A protein has these predicted regions:
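Basic, alpha-helical nucleic-acid-binding regions used in initiation and control of genome expression
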Residues: 2-108
Length: 108
């Protein structure tokens, strides 16, 4: 069976993934260095999303960032779309998460 994802599905999957990232950050706050390294590598301050994340990472505590990425409101959903947390989860973990999400939602 083919599972076509709409925007709500994509947002729910992103929230699920970010909750796992949040748990990892709580257990290992030093992983915030991954986000800082990604921002330095992406270095595009002319982009609004980059500026927003740069401000978030430089002005908020790890716990505040975690609370932000776990929120379910529209603003948090928008912010998660450009989150700099690539590399905190392994490619295998991301693949398994996506597969599990697809299987759970295809059955619904």
């Amino acid at each position: 069976m083919i599972f076509a994802m709409n925007h709500q599905d994509i947002d729910r999957r992103s929230l699920m993934m970010h909750r796992i990232i949040a748990a990892r950050l709580r257990a290992q706050p030093e992983l915030m260095a991954v986000a800082h390294a990604n921002m330095a590598r992406w270095n595009c301050p002319e982009r609004g999303w980059w500026q927003e994340w740069s401000t978030i990472l430089s002005s908020q505590t790890v716990e505040e960032v975690i609370q932000l990425i776990e929120r379910e409101d529209e603003d948090a959903c928008r912010i998660r779309q450009s989150a700099p947390f690539a590399g905190i989860l392994t490619p295998r973990e991301v693949w398994e998460l996506k597969r599990n999400f697809k299987e759970e939602n295809a059955a619904a």
